[in-house]
Amino acid sequence: MIGKLKGTIEEIGEDYALVDVHGVCYVAYCSARTLSRLGSVGEACILFIETYVREDQIRLFGFMAVLEREWFNLLQTVQGVGAKVALALLSTLTPSELANAIALQDRTAVSRAPGVGPKVAMRIVTELKNKVPAFAGEATNIGFKQELGEGVAPAPVSDAVSALTNLGYSRDQAANAIAAAMKVAGDEADSAKLIRLGLKELSR
Protein backbone atom coordinates (compact mmCIF):
# COMPACT_ATOMS: atom_id res chain seq x y z
CA MET A 1 0.00 0.00 0.00
CA ILE A 2 1.23 3.47 -0.88
CA GLY A 3 0.68 6.04 1.88
CA LYS A 4 2.58 9.06 0.58
CA LEU A 5 4.29 10.24 -2.59
CA LYS A 6 7.24 12.62 -2.46
CA GLY A 7 8.54 13.60 -5.86
CA THR A 8 8.32 16.03 -8.77
CA ILE A 9 5.21 17.10 -10.65
CA GLU A 10 5.43 15.67 -14.16
CA GLU A 11 1.96 16.63 -15.36
CA ILE A 12 -1.29 18.07 -14.03
CA GLY A 13 -4.50 16.96 -15.71
CA GLU A 14 -8.13 17.88 -15.20
CA ASP A 15 -8.57 15.49 -12.28
CA TYR A 16 -5.14 14.00 -11.66
CA ALA A 17 -1.47 14.72 -11.05
CA LEU A 18 1.38 12.68 -12.48
CA VAL A 19 4.18 12.53 -9.90
CA ASP A 20 7.71 11.37 -10.72
CA VAL A 21 9.29 9.53 -7.79
CA HIS A 22 12.87 8.56 -8.67
CA GLY A 23 11.98 7.87 -12.29
CA VAL A 24 8.70 6.06 -11.61
CA CYS A 25 5.60 8.11 -12.44
CA TYR A 26 2.41 7.67 -10.43
CA VAL A 27 -1.05 8.90 -11.41
CA ALA A 28 -2.89 10.31 -8.39
CA TYR A 29 -6.49 11.45 -8.73
CA CYS A 30 -7.10 14.64 -6.76
CA SER A 31 -9.75 17.19 -5.91
CA ALA A 32 -9.70 20.45 -7.85
CA ARG A 33 -8.70 22.20 -4.63
CA THR A 34 -5.64 19.97 -4.21
CA LEU A 35 -4.62 20.37 -7.85
CA SER A 36 -4.85 24.17 -7.58
CA ARG A 37 -2.51 24.16 -4.57
CA LEU A 38 -0.09 21.53 -5.79
CA GLY A 39 2.27 23.74 -7.76
CA SER A 40 3.58 23.72 -11.32
CA VAL A 41 5.20 21.10 -13.51
CA GLY A 42 8.78 20.52 -12.41
CA GLU A 43 8.18 21.53 -8.80
CA ALA A 44 8.57 19.23 -5.82
CA CYS A 45 5.39 17.97 -4.17
CA ILE A 46 4.12 15.73 -1.41
CA LEU A 47 0.79 13.93 -1.62
CA PHE A 48 -0.85 11.78 1.03
CA ILE A 49 -2.26 8.76 -0.75
CA GLU A 50 -5.31 6.55 -0.42
CA THR A 51 -4.80 3.37 -2.45
CA TYR A 52 -7.77 1.55 -3.99
CA VAL A 53 -7.10 -1.98 -5.16
CA ARG A 54 -9.63 -3.61 -7.47
CA GLU A 55 -9.51 -6.84 -9.44
CA ASP A 56 -8.65 -5.03 -12.66
CA GLN A 57 -6.84 -1.90 -11.46
CA ILE A 58 -5.04 -0.01 -8.74
CA ARG A 59 -5.99 3.66 -8.29
CA LEU A 60 -4.24 6.27 -6.18
CA PHE A 61 -6.03 9.28 -4.73
CA GLY A 62 -3.85 12.16 -3.59
CA PHE A 63 -4.38 14.81 -0.92
CA MET A 64 -2.41 17.79 0.36
CA ALA A 65 -3.37 17.06 3.97
CA VAL A 66 -4.22 13.99 6.03
CA LEU A 67 -7.49 15.64 7.12
CA GLU A 68 -8.66 15.83 3.52
CA ARG A 69 -7.87 12.14 3.06
CA GLU A 70 -9.86 11.30 6.20
CA TRP A 71 -12.84 13.23 4.85
CA PHE A 72 -12.51 11.41 1.52
CA ASN A 73 -12.93 8.10 3.34
CA LEU A 74 -15.63 9.36 5.70
CA LEU A 75 -17.80 10.68 2.88
CA GLN A 76 -17.77 7.29 1.19
CA THR A 77 -19.41 5.66 4.20
CA VAL A 78 -22.60 7.33 2.98
CA GLN A 79 -24.72 5.34 0.54
CA GLY A 80 -24.49 6.82 -2.95
CA VAL A 81 -21.12 8.50 -2.38
CA GLY A 82 -18.20 6.96 -4.22
CA ALA A 83 -14.70 8.22 -4.88
CA LYS A 84 -15.79 10.53 -7.71
CA VAL A 85 -18.50 12.23 -5.65
CA ALA A 86 -16.23 12.45 -2.60
CA LEU A 87 -13.62 14.28 -4.70
CA ALA A 88 -16.32 16.56 -6.10
CA LEU A 89 -17.39 17.44 -2.56
CA LEU A 90 -13.80 18.18 -1.55
CA SER A 91 -13.38 20.26 -4.70
CA THR A 92 -16.39 22.37 -3.74
CA LEU A 93 -16.10 22.59 0.06
CA THR A 94 -13.14 22.62 2.43
CA PRO A 95 -13.16 20.10 5.30
CA SER A 96 -14.13 22.97 7.60
CA GLU A 97 -17.02 23.98 5.36
CA LEU A 98 -18.17 20.37 5.13
CA ALA A 99 -18.11 20.05 8.92
CA ASN A 100 -20.10 23.26 9.27
CA ALA A 101 -22.66 22.20 6.66
CA ILE A 102 -23.18 18.85 8.37
CA ALA A 103 -23.44 20.40 11.83
CA LEU A 104 -25.95 22.96 10.57
CA GLN A 105 -27.77 20.27 8.53
CA ASP A 106 -27.27 22.54 5.52
CA ARG A 107 -27.96 20.21 2.62
CA THR A 108 -28.07 23.17 0.20
CA ALA A 109 -24.36 23.82 0.75
CA VAL A 110 -23.56 20.13 0.28
CA SER A 111 -25.62 19.87 -2.92
CA ARG A 112 -23.46 22.54 -4.56
CA ALA A 113 -20.99 19.79 -5.42
CA PRO A 114 -21.41 18.25 -8.90
CA GLY A 115 -23.16 14.90 -8.77
CA VAL A 116 -24.74 15.51 -5.37
CA GLY A 117 -28.52 15.65 -5.59
CA PRO A 118 -30.97 16.53 -2.80
CA LYS A 119 -31.35 12.91 -1.61
CA VAL A 120 -27.61 12.27 -1.39
CA ALA A 121 -27.07 15.66 0.28
CA MET A 122 -29.69 14.78 2.90
CA ARG A 123 -28.05 11.41 3.55
CA ILE A 124 -24.67 13.08 3.97
CA VAL A 125 -25.81 15.64 6.54
CA THR A 126 -27.96 13.09 8.37
CA GLU A 127 -25.67 10.06 8.44
CA LEU A 128 -22.48 11.99 9.22
CA LYS A 129 -23.88 14.28 11.90
CA ASN A 130 -22.62 12.09 14.73
CA LYS A 131 -19.44 10.99 12.96
CA VAL A 132 -17.97 14.41 12.23
CA PRO A 133 -16.35 15.13 15.65
CA ALA A 134 -13.85 12.31 15.22
CA PHE A 135 -12.68 13.77 11.91
CA ALA A 136 -13.16 17.50 12.31
CA GLY A 137 -10.13 18.12 14.51
CA GLU A 138 -9.72 21.88 14.69
CA ALA A 139 -11.56 22.41 11.42
CA THR A 140 -14.61 23.81 13.15
CA ASN A 141 -15.85 25.12 16.49
CA ILE A 142 -19.40 23.96 16.00
CA GLY A 143 -21.21 22.04 18.73
CA PHE A 144 -22.13 18.88 16.90
CA LYS A 145 -24.62 17.59 19.44
CA GLN A 146 -27.16 20.29 18.72
CA GLU A 147 -30.32 19.13 17.04
CA LEU A 148 -30.79 21.59 14.21
CA GLY A 149 -33.74 20.11 12.37
CA GLU A 150 -34.17 17.67 9.52
CA GLY A 151 -32.34 18.36 6.29
CA VAL A 152 -31.90 22.13 6.41
CA ALA A 153 -30.76 24.64 8.99
CA PRO A 154 -33.58 26.42 10.85
CA ALA A 155 -34.52 29.82 9.42
CA PRO A 156 -32.94 31.89 12.25
CA VAL A 157 -29.64 30.05 11.79
CA SER A 158 -29.65 30.44 8.00
CA ASP A 159 -30.66 34.10 8.29
CA ALA A 160 -27.93 34.80 10.83
CA VAL A 161 -25.23 33.10 8.76
CA SER A 162 -26.43 34.97 5.67
CA ALA A 163 -26.39 38.29 7.53
CA LEU A 164 -22.78 37.81 8.62
CA THR A 165 -21.65 36.82 5.13
CA ASN A 166 -23.36 39.95 3.79
CA LEU A 167 -21.21 41.94 6.22
CA GLY A 168 -18.11 40.57 4.53
CA TYR A 169 -17.28 37.52 6.62
CA SER A 170 -16.63 34.21 4.89
CA ARG A 171 -19.27 31.50 5.17
CA ASP A 172 -16.85 29.48 7.28
CA GLN A 173 -16.32 32.38 9.72
CA ALA A 174 -20.04 33.10 9.84
CA ALA A 175 -21.03 29.48 10.47
CA ASN A 176 -18.46 29.10 13.25
CA ALA A 177 -19.59 32.33 14.90
CA ILE A 178 -23.29 31.42 14.77
CA ALA A 179 -22.54 27.93 16.09
CA ALA A 180 -20.76 29.52 19.05
CA ALA A 181 -23.70 31.90 19.49
CA MET A 182 -26.12 28.97 19.61
CA LYS A 183 -24.15 27.44 22.47
CA VAL A 184 -24.87 30.60 24.46
CA ALA A 185 -28.36 31.45 23.25
CA GLY A 186 -29.83 27.99 22.76
CA ASP A 187 -31.66 26.45 19.83
CA GLU A 188 -34.73 28.68 20.18
CA ALA A 189 -32.88 31.98 19.75
CA ASP A 190 -34.08 34.31 16.99
CA SER A 191 -31.84 35.54 14.19
CA ALA A 192 -31.30 38.99 15.73
CA LYS A 193 -29.89 37.51 18.92
CA LEU A 194 -27.73 35.06 16.99
CA ILE A 195 -26.34 37.86 14.83
CA ARG A 196 -25.54 40.00 17.87
CA LEU A 197 -23.78 37.14 19.64
CA GLY A 198 -22.08 36.07 16.42
CA LEU A 199 -20.62 39.54 15.92
CA LYS A 200 -19.43 39.52 19.51
CA GLU A 201 -17.71 36.20 18.86
CA LEU A 202 -16.05 37.54 15.71
CA SER A 203 -14.79 40.65 17.50
CA ARG A 204 -12.73 38.61 19.97
Curated annotation (Swiss-Prot):
<feature type="region of interest" description="Domain II">
    <location>
        <begin position="65"/>
        <end position="143"/>
    </location>
</feature>
<dbReference type="Pfam" id="PF07499">
    <property type="entry name" value="RuvA_C"/>
</dbReference>
<dbReference type="GO" id="GO:0009379">
    <property type="term" value="C:Holliday junction helicase complex"/>
</dbReference>
<keyword id="KW-0234">DNA repair</keyword>
<dbReference type="InterPro" id="IPR013849">
    <property type="entry name" value="DNA_helicase_Holl-junc_RuvA_I"/>
</dbReference>
<dbReference type="GO" id="GO:0005524">
    <property type="term" value="F:ATP binding"/>
</dbReference>
<keyword id="KW-0233">DNA recombination</keyword>
<keyword id="KW-0963">Cytoplasm</keyword>
<comment type="subunit">
    <text>Homotetramer. Forms an RuvA(8)-RuvB(12)-Holliday junction (HJ) complex. HJ DNA is sandwiched between 2 RuvA tetramers; dsDNA enters through RuvA and exits via RuvB. An RuvB hexamer assembles on each DNA strand where it exits the tetramer. Each RuvB hexamer is contacted by two RuvA subunits (via domain III) on 2 adjacent RuvB subunits; this complex drives branch migration. In the full resolvosome a probable DNA-RuvA(4)-RuvB(12)-RuvC(2) complex forms which resolves the HJ.</text>
</comment>
<dbReference type="InterPro" id="IPR000085">
    <property type="entry name" value="RuvA"/>
</dbReference>
<dbReference type="InterPro" id="IPR010994">
    <property type="entry name" value="RuvA_2-like"/>
</dbReference>
<dbReference type="GO" id="GO:0000400">
    <property type="term" value="F:four-way junction DNA binding"/>
</dbReference>
<dbReference type="GO" id="GO:0009378">
    <property type="term" value="F:four-way junction helicase activity"/>
</dbReference>
<feature type="region of interest" description="Domain I">
    <location>
        <begin position="1"/>
        <end position="64"/>
    </location>
</feature>
<comment type="similarity">
    <text>Belongs to the RuvA family.</text>
</comment>
<keyword id="KW-0227">DNA damage</keyword>
<protein>
    <recommendedName>
        <fullName>Holliday junction branch migration complex subunit RuvA</fullName>
    </recommendedName>
</protein>
<dbReference type="GO" id="GO:0006281">
    <property type="term" value="P:DNA repair"/>
</dbReference>
<keyword id="KW-0238">DNA-binding</keyword>
<dbReference type="GO" id="GO:0048476">
    <property type="term" value="C:Holliday junction resolvase complex"/>
</dbReference>
<dbReference type="Pfam" id="PF14520">
    <property type="entry name" value="HHH_5"/>
</dbReference>
<dbReference type="InterPro" id="IPR012340">
    <property type="entry name" value="NA-bd_OB-fold"/>
</dbReference>
<dbReference type="InterPro" id="IPR036267">
    <property type="entry name" value="RuvA_C_sf"/>
</dbReference>
<dbReference type="GO" id="GO:0006310">
    <property type="term" value="P:DNA recombination"/>
</dbReference>
<dbReference type="Pfam" id="PF01330">
    <property type="entry name" value="RuvA_N"/>
</dbReference>
<feature type="region of interest" description="Domain III">
    <location>
        <begin position="152"/>
        <end position="204"/>
    </location>
</feature>
<dbReference type="InterPro" id="IPR011114">
    <property type="entry name" value="RuvA_C"/>
</dbReference>
<comment type="function">
    <text>The RuvA-RuvB-RuvC complex processes Holliday junction (HJ) DNA during genetic recombination and DNA repair, while the RuvA-RuvB complex plays an important role in the rescue of blocked DNA replication forks via replication fork reversal (RFR). RuvA specifically binds to HJ cruciform DNA, conferring on it an open structure. The RuvB hexamer acts as an ATP-dependent pump, pulling dsDNA into and through the RuvAB complex. HJ branch migration allows RuvC to scan DNA until it finds its consensus sequence, where it cleaves and resolves the cruciform DNA.</text>
</comment>
<dbReference type="GO" id="GO:0005737">
    <property type="term" value="C:cytoplasm"/>
</dbReference>
<feature type="region of interest" description="Flexible linker">
    <location>
        <begin position="144"/>
        <end position="151"/>
    </location>
</feature>
